[in-house]
């Protein structure tokens, strides 16, 4: 089923819009020029160019984790979350047993932000919505389409426990989060997916050159925005990005996202290496791997 779905994915003209208003604190400023989006979608174009940026580039990995992959594990994961599942297999098995599924036929867009009230700027269609517990403060039914897939990006074992408790209506998990996640979340289990940590590993190791094993007090992780682009590079023939920018740190009042008033200053102590992310995105633009739709 996976191979069949992957074949459909590669055969479909996929337009992958990452609508994350993504402005980050740093000392220097990066401005990505607007590129002409009146471009045809050449089949296999991204797949041909991606190896120039991503070493050992492969489209063989599944997008989501599936139950069948964890009953008889012949090659256990080498890394803990968010780059692997080492040490979290039991919790993952329980969660996967709730969210059994098959892959969709096509992926058109990835969006991790509100739609209602912003339709003119971000459109109305959301095929995939990336989230993690602390970012799940949205209505799964009101802010999505009926067939939107809710994709959990697991950063830590507690994320699996929270998702399991929500879907099974068990005692809620309250500790172990940097921000309190929702205690009530009206989601259809059949629409929930667990992202394959492989793509977080590729983003960190191949695009940002971050070590997979870091001291506990120094934990640098990719942002979900850069992760979203990495996913697109592995599944689409044409990748457009919108809203990505890195203004000068002097613009302290600049909001991070289009839908809230949190400013750049809040990113000063984050776990994200935004300098490397800016360089990675600029390299993608230079290679023609992605097209920029907006000027920040």
Regions found by a protein language model. Name each.
Residues 1-296:
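Metal-ion/cofactor- or nucleotide/acyl-coenzyme-handling active-site neighborhoods
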């Amino acid at each position: 089923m996976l191979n069949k779905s992957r074949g459909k994915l590669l055969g479909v003209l996929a337009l992958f819009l990452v609508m994350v208003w993504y402005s980050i604190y740093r000392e220097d400023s990066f401005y990505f020029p607007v590129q002409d989006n009146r471009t045809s979608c050449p089949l296999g174009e991204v797949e041909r160019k991606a190896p120039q940026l991503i070493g050992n580039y492969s489209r063989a990995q599944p997008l989501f984790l599936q139950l069948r992959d964890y009953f008889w594990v012949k090659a256990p994961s080498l890394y803990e979350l968010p780059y692997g599942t080492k040490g979290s297999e039991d919790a993952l098995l329980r969660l996967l047993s709730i969210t059994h599924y098959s892959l969709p036929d096509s992926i058109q867009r990835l969006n991790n932000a509100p739609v209602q009230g912003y339709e003119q700027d971000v459109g109305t269609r959301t095929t995939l919505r990336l989230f993690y517990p602390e970012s799940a403060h949205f209505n799964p039914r009101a802010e999505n389409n009926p067939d939107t897939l809710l994709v959990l990006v697991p950063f830590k074992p507690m994320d699996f426990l929270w998702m399991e408790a929500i879907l099974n209506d068990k005692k809620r998990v309250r500790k172990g989060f940097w921000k309190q996640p929702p205690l009530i979340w009206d989601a259809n289990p059949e629409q929930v997916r667990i992202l394959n940590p492989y793509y977080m590993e590729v983003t960190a190791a191949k695009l940002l050159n971050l070590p997979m094993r870091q001291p506990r007090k120094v934990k640098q992780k990719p942002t979900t925005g850069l992760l979203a682009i990495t996913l697109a590079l592995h599944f689409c023939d044409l990748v457009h990005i919108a809203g990505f920018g890195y203004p000068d740190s002097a613009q302290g009042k600049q909001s991070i996202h289009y839908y809230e008033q949190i400013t750049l200053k809040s990113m000063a102590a984050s776990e994200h290496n935004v300098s490397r992310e800016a360089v990675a995105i600029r390299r993608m633009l230079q290679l023609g791997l992605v097209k920029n739709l907006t000027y920040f």
